């Protein structure tokens, strides 16, 4: 089932969760680009889809979709969580979804290999994005902060 542009734009800003928990296997092997440029592009697609898209006929569904759009804007544009929360980047490295028997082994293995091949890009995006991690979080994971003063 194809997704409407608005739903697709929301899903594109939550790739690891959508792949793992919604079973959207078109995202297999394709980690989300959480670099600053990648997030800006995703937010631009979200805004364009919202501006160009029709409201859903069902008011309940429309309310859920609108709330999801707001959540993505708050998470990525206002709070910039991709710049301060390493877990978002770690989620893009997760390969566990390929362990389930949702498709033939060969298809899952190919998706896993494609996903692993993208790891350098995911790591580069994390390095380029994570410039607002709090010092206590950094110290717990990496050791003491060295000051140049």
Question: Where do the language-model regions lie?
Answer:
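N-terminal maturation segment of proteins
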Residues: 1-149
